[in-house]
Amino acid sequence: MSWLEKILEKSNIVSSRKASIPEGVWTKCTSCEQVLYYAELERNLEVCPKCDHHMRMKARRRLETFLDQGERVELGEELEPQDKLKFKDSKRYKERLAAAQKASGEKDALVVMKGAVLGVPVVACAFEFSFMGGSMGSVVGARFVRAVEAAMEHNCGLICFSASGGARMQEALMSLMQMAKTSAALERLSDKGLPFISVMTDPTMGGVSASLAMLGDINIGEPKALIGFAGRRVIEQTVREELPEGFQRSEFLLEHGAIDMIVDRRDMRQRVASLLAKMTGQASPLVVSVNDAPNEAPYAVPEANKKG
């Protein structure tokens, strides 16, 4: 080995210290793969500023950014899941629950809060998809019924942000029963003349889409949200036909009348508050009082020329 090769040998070269970048500062859009400053993405409600892709949002953050500050009260937080069936597949259900609670920071897959949106009273609930795929079990059903009862008690509307893969298989029939339980609760809400607005986010599938998510007086979808019962691959294998482009996306569902409207997440507060106000007979938060309108400049109507 020559003297030059010894100098250039990697072991003799002092490596330059890499600048350490704290984790969580940068992230990447899951659609266009644009590198994004995470703080800016948070301010934009998890919507990519380049391609407007709506990323999945934590349930608690969704409610905290949707409801007015200072008026939020959580409901049903004392309810916790139990492994009554002692269920075990590749892993015990208790272990799955513990892992999901640690990863998501929630006790179960639904968060319920009472509050107001732009001054309009409302009870709102949101699914936490990172908790076992937002699956609906007995606690999710119980918390949703608690939300319905709170809406009836306070004579206000109910809104639910769905993000779920469906019923929780580890709870077997008890999870399937929640489909009927939540649907019956919404029937009581309807009998009292109170509105239910369902917002379907990406993804809303399975037993949740087949029950509470599609029972809204107004059904709203977020842009490009996956909404349906069975997955595309399962349907294609069953019917043995190729499905059209964009099948089960919110735009496709709107075009075919399955949902009522698509609303950008950044416009959700104003749109929902306006709908709730109209459906409950309250003053719309978007309507400005006539007394608050700016005064017009004085204008004199010219007299018509008199004929001599």
Curated annotation (Swiss-Prot):
<comment type="similarity">
    <text>Belongs to the AccD/PCCB family.</text>
</comment>
<keyword id="KW-0479">Metal-binding</keyword>
<dbReference type="GO" id="GO:2001295">
    <property type="term" value="P:malonyl-CoA biosynthetic process"/>
</dbReference>
<feature type="binding site">
    <location>
        <position position="29"/>
    </location>
    <ligand>
        <name>Zn(2+)</name>
    </ligand>
</feature>
<keyword id="KW-0547">Nucleotide-binding</keyword>
<dbReference type="Pfam" id="PF17848">
    <property type="entry name" value="Zn_ribbon_ACC"/>
</dbReference>
<protein>
    <recommendedName>
        <fullName>Acetyl-coenzyme A carboxylase carboxyl transferase subunit beta</fullName>
        <ecNumber>2.1.3.15</ecNumber>
    </recommendedName>
</protein>
<dbReference type="InterPro" id="IPR011762">
    <property type="entry name" value="COA_CT_N"/>
</dbReference>
<keyword id="KW-0275">Fatty acid biosynthesis</keyword>
<keyword id="KW-0443">Lipid metabolism</keyword>
<dbReference type="InterPro" id="IPR029045">
    <property type="entry name" value="ClpP/crotonase-like_dom_sf"/>
</dbReference>
<keyword id="KW-0808">Transferase</keyword>
<keyword id="KW-0444">Lipid biosynthesis</keyword>
<keyword id="KW-0863">Zinc-finger</keyword>
<dbReference type="Pfam" id="PF01039">
    <property type="entry name" value="Carboxyl_trans"/>
</dbReference>
<dbReference type="InterPro" id="IPR034733">
    <property type="entry name" value="AcCoA_carboxyl_beta"/>
</dbReference>
<dbReference type="GO" id="GO:0005524">
    <property type="term" value="F:ATP binding"/>
</dbReference>
<dbReference type="GO" id="GO:0008270">
    <property type="term" value="F:zinc ion binding"/>
</dbReference>
<comment type="pathway">
    <text>Lipid metabolism; malonyl-CoA biosynthesis; malonyl-CoA from acetyl-CoA: step 1/1.</text>
</comment>
<keyword id="KW-0862">Zinc</keyword>
<keyword id="KW-0276">Fatty acid metabolism</keyword>
<dbReference type="GO" id="GO:0009329">
    <property type="term" value="C:acetate CoA-transferase complex"/>
</dbReference>
<dbReference type="GO" id="GO:0016743">
    <property type="term" value="F:carboxyl- or carbamoyltransferase activity"/>
</dbReference>
<keyword id="KW-0963">Cytoplasm</keyword>
<feature type="zinc finger region" description="C4-type">
    <location>
        <begin position="29"/>
        <end position="51"/>
    </location>
</feature>
<comment type="subunit">
    <text>Acetyl-CoA carboxylase is a heterohexamer composed of biotin carboxyl carrier protein (AccB), biotin carboxylase (AccC) and two subunits each of ACCase subunit alpha (AccA) and ACCase subunit beta (AccD).</text>
</comment>
<feature type="binding site">
    <location>
        <position position="48"/>
    </location>
    <ligand>
        <name>Zn(2+)</name>
    </ligand>
</feature>
<comment type="function">
    <text>Component of the acetyl coenzyme A carboxylase (ACC) complex. Biotin carboxylase (BC) catalyzes the carboxylation of biotin on its carrier protein (BCCP) and then the CO(2) group is transferred by the transcarboxylase to acetyl-CoA to form malonyl-CoA.</text>
</comment>
<keyword id="KW-0067">ATP-binding</keyword>
<feature type="binding site">
    <location>
        <position position="51"/>
    </location>
    <ligand>
        <name>Zn(2+)</name>
    </ligand>
</feature>
<feature type="domain" description="CoA carboxyltransferase N-terminal">
    <location>
        <begin position="25"/>
        <end position="294"/>
    </location>
</feature>
<dbReference type="GO" id="GO:0006633">
    <property type="term" value="P:fatty acid biosynthetic process"/>
</dbReference>
<feature type="binding site">
    <location>
        <position position="32"/>
    </location>
    <ligand>
        <name>Zn(2+)</name>
    </ligand>
</feature>
<dbReference type="InterPro" id="IPR000438">
    <property type="entry name" value="Acetyl_CoA_COase_Trfase_b_su"/>
</dbReference>
<dbReference type="InterPro" id="IPR041010">
    <property type="entry name" value="Znf-ACC"/>
</dbReference>
<dbReference type="GO" id="GO:0003989">
    <property type="term" value="F:acetyl-CoA carboxylase activity"/>
</dbReference>
